[in-house]
């Protein structure tokens, strides 16, 4: 009696239609992040620019940990548009966009490591990346002078970094981390995944 023919293992591939749908979803998500970020910065312009700022829209930065490239691209484009209206020139437009892309990418990669506390560490590094880049070029283009506090000379660059760091501590590490925890709940990511959206969670 002949044995039944061996059926080769088959790994399904995404067809052109499904791949196109996923690309459309990712593009829409990037556009959504870009729009919300830009609108948030422009509407809250008085507290979103200069060395001492609390850019509330930066609460979206940790979303790069959860959504990867669609969020990174959206936050980069959103910053580019927002900073164009900020009045600080092309250095702010380019520098802020680079800061968002670098911070988002690094945070996403740290989040993918999935060690205990990886998301918290990722948001701290995100803050430090934004602080280092934005604080430096704002010090440069605004020529921030040294300041004297209680007889101690504080370099202008240090003051600029401190201003950005404290604002990002509120926007990224407090508001953003809380938003990240809320959106990572199964009740939220379940419907997103059912529509073909890739979500990176600690459980994967």
Question: What are the residue ranges of the model-derived segments?
Answer:
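Intrinsically disordered, low-complexity non-transmembrane regions of multi-pass membrane transporters
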Residues: 1-21, 185-204
């Amino acid at each position: 009696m002949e044995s039944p023919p061996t059926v080769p293992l088959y790994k399904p591939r995404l067809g052109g239609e499904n791949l196109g749908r996923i690309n459309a979803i990712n593009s829409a998500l990037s556009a959504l992040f870009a729009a919300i970020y830009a609108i948030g910065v422009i509407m809250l312009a008085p507290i979103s620019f200069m060395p001492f700022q609390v850019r509330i829209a930066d609460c979206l930065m940790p979303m790069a940990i959860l959504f990867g490239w669609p969020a990174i691209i959206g936050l980069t484009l959103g910053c580019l548009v927002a900073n164009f209206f900020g009045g600080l020139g092309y250095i702010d437009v380019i520098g802020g966009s680079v800061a968002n892309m670098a911070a988002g990418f690094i945070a996403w990669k740290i989040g993918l490591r999935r060690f205990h506390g990886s998301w918290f560490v990722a948001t701290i590094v995100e803050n430090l990346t934004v602080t280092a880049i934005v604080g430096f070029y704002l010090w440069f283009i605004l020529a921030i002078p040294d300041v004297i506090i209680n007889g101690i000379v504080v370099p202008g660059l240090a003051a600029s970094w401190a201003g950005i760091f404290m604002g990002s501590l509120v926007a990224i590490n407090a508001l953003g981390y809380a938003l990240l925890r809320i959106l990572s709940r199964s009740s939220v990511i379940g419907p997103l995944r059912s529509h073909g959206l890739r979500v990176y969670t600690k459980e994967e």
